[in-house]
Amino acid sequence: MKEEDVINLSSKCNFNATKAIPLKLEASGREDWRVLDKKDSLVLCYLNPSLGDHLDFLKISNLLNANNICTAEVIYHNPDIGVTLQKDLGDDDLLTIFNEENKQDLLKRSLDLLAKIQGLPQEEIPKLTHDELVDQMHLFKDIFCINFLEVEPDNSIDNLMLLTTENIKQQPWVNCHFDFERRNLILHQDKITVIDHQDMKIGPLGIDLSGILIDHYYPVNFTDINMMLDYFSKQIKSKHDSEELFNFLRWGSIQRNMRILGTLANIFIEHKRSYRLKDLPMILSNLECMIPDNHKSKLFISEQLKPLLNKKLLDI
């Protein structure tokens, strides 16, 4: 959308904005804008009603608020035009403010928040199905490899998907934000606030652990991961030790990164949006890193996919 379109939408929601600043465009098609009048600012989230609605977001927002979990207050909702207006939490997302000095504190506080989310009542939260988890991994094979890189994966990728499915089925299934990563966590008034929670499902424990501990913008850091898993195990008084939690995280990260590589490639193929292509090499590298050393897919990624991806990005 253009700025004038957003200003016009905000006026239909009883907020007479004089300026609109784009914040981010999500893979789902949601657009977040900061809208400002002479004395206040809000966040306008737009989703074309033909593509979906905000009902899941509103339902989860109410659940979070009812259980004292910090999230953006929804001030206005107009389903006919696909808009919510939310309290502006500022720009201090954890990806932006994260550094060597504060990372341990922020990661521990994020894990505390994750534990609270996992403890929410589950009656209103749908459960991920086996088929959904498998279909998400197939995005990697069918979209990222075949359609985007134009390479036919060898049997090691099918075996990796099968092995991942078997492992994540054996994990504890808990409330899963599904995108519990640093850019979706905002430090506001010294509290970590969670956003973009509309896709919350009951799913494997390792998916959200990998979201916060294996970021798309940094190489895997096993020292930090092991330290934080030890902390998390003690905080939630888990019957699973840090070694078991690492196994959950490993397979959760493999499923998650395969899904995201396919999703981001599809955004470019279907909509010609290239804004996330720069993230693909690190996501692929982290996927390779988390695959067990003796698995043949590791070699396929290293020798075939990584060179093809680098060439593809140079050609775009």
Walk through the language-model features, giving the residues of each.
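All-alpha amphipathic helical-bundle segments outside canonical DNA-binding/catalytic cores
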Residues: P126-E132, D241-S253, K278
